[in-house]
Amino acid sequence: MLIINDNNLSGPLQRVNGTGELSVQFKDGRSRISRLYQEGAAKIRMPQAVTGPLEAILINTSGGLTGGDRLKWDVALDDGASAVITTQACERIYRSGGGEARIATRLKAAKGTRLAWLPQETILFNRSILSRRLDVELEEGAQMLVVEATVFGRLAMGERVVAARFADRWRVRLGGRVIHAEEFRLGPDVGAELQAPAVAGGACAMATVLMVCEQAGRHLETARAIIGEEGGCSLWRVGKASKLVVRLYAPDSYALRRRLCPLVALLNGKAGLPKVWTI
C-alpha cells in the first residue's frame, strides 16, 4: 500500500465533499430537468439547447481531489429523455497526504432513453491515490455511451508518475442483469507497471469506451479504423442489445484525444462532441 507521511502537516485537513444529482424527463417535445440537487463542491450547469439532448456540465469547484476527498454524481433519465453529461475540465487527483480520493458515479436510464457519459480525462499526479466507481442501471430499450479516460502525469509539463494507486470499478446492468464489469487496479509502482507490454507498453494515457444499443455493430469497422494499432475494439451480443467495447492507449493526453474525439463524435451520433471538448 502506498503510504505518504508529511510531518509538516498539523491539525485536521479540510476535505472536499461534493454531491450532484440530476434527473431528466421528456416533456413538451424536449428533454428537460425534472430534478437538480447540488451540495458542496459539486455543481451542474446546463448550456441552453433548443433541440437535441439536454447537455449538462459537471464542475468540481475545488479544482481537484486528494486523499480523503469525496465526489458523487447521480444522473437519471426518465422514459424517452436524452442527455449528454460531461465535465468542465479534466479532474485532477493530487498527491495524497493520507487516504484515498473517491469518485462515485451512478447512472440510470429508462426505456427509450439515450444517455452519454463523457467526462474529460482524469489526471493522476505522482503519489496520488484514487478509487473510482461507476454503477449503471439500464432498462431494456435504453441506449448508453460511456467514456472514461485516465492520464498518469502531464508529459508536456515534465510530470511523470512513479508511485500512485488507482482502482477503477464498473458495474453495468441491463434489465437487472450484469452485462459489463471491470476491476482495474494499478500501483503502487505505477511507473514500472505502465511499462509492461500487457498493461500499457510505456503509454501513460488510456481510455475505455463502452456503447450499449441495439445497433452498436454498425460502428465496429469505422471505430477500428480510428483506433489504429494502439488499442482494440470488440462487439458482443447482450440479449436484444449489443455491446461495443473500445480500449485506447497513447504516449500522452494529446495523442489520446486525437483519436478519442473522432471516436466519440462517431458513436454519439447527431449529438457529436460536447461543446467543452477541445484538442
Swiss-Prot record:
Transmembrane regions: none
GO terms, molecular function: nickel cation binding
InterPro entries documented for this protein: UreD
Pfam entry (one): UreD
Tree of life domain: Bacteria
Alphabetized UniProt keyword annotations: Chaperone, Cytoplasm, Nickel insertion
Cellular compartments annotated: Cytoplasm
Protein's UniProt keywords contain Lyase: no
Claim: Nuclease is one of the keywords in the record: no
GO CC, one annotated term: cytoplasm
Subunit details: UreD, UreF and UreG form a complex that acts as a GTP-hydrolysis-dependent molecular chaperone, activating the urease apoprotein by helping to assemble the nickel containing metallocenter of UreC. The UreE protein probably delivers the nickel.
Function: Required for maturation of urease via the functional incorporation of the urease nickel metallocenter.
Stated family: Belongs to the UreD family.
Miscellaneous remark of the record: The second copy of ureD in this organism is annotated as a pseudogene.
HAMAP family listed in its UniProt record: UreD (MF_01384)
Protein name as annotated: Urease accessory protein UreD
UniProt source species: Brucella suis (strain ATCC 23445 / NCTC 10510)
